[in-house]
Amino acid sequence: MRKIILVTTTNCPRCGYIRRTVFEPVKEKCPEQCYTVNGSAAPEFVKRYDIKGAPSILFLEDDERAGIAYKTFEVDNIIKWLKGEKYHD
C-alpha cells in the first residue's frame, strides 16, 4: 500500500523564494528578508480536499522499490487524483 504525503509549496511574491511545509506549521523568512511565509500541509487537507497554494507536490512512497516516486500536480489535478477522476499531466 502506498502512503500519501502532501507537500504544499508557497513562494515569496517579491523574490520568488520557495519553501515547503510538511505536516507541522512552520514560520520562515525568505533569504531576501522581504516576506514571511506561514503554513502547514496537514492530513486534514487531503480529507477535506481543501488544498491551498499551487503548485503542490504529491509524494507517493513506493514500498516495492524502497524509494520515493513523485510527480508534480497542479492543485486541481491533486483533487481529481484523490477522487479517482482523470487529470492532465
Stretch-by-stretch model annotation:
Residues 4-7, 55-57, 78:
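Hydrophobic beta-strand residues in large extracellular and virion-surface proteins
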Residues 19-22, 49-51, 72-73:
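Short, glycine/charged-enriched secondary-structure capping and boundary segments
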Residues 45-49, 82:
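Short amphipathic alpha-helix with an adjacent loop that forms part of the alpha/beta core around
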Residues 49-60:
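Structural micro-motif
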Residues 1-28:
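Local sequence-structure signature of Cys/Sec-based thiol-disulfide redox active-site neighborhoods
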Residues 59-89:
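Non-catalytic, surface beta->alpha helical segment in thiol-disulfide oxidoreductase systems
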Residues 6-9, 30-44:
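Thiol-based oxidoreductase modules, predominantly thioredoxin-like and allied folds used
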Residues 13-14, 41, 73:
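Short alpha-helical
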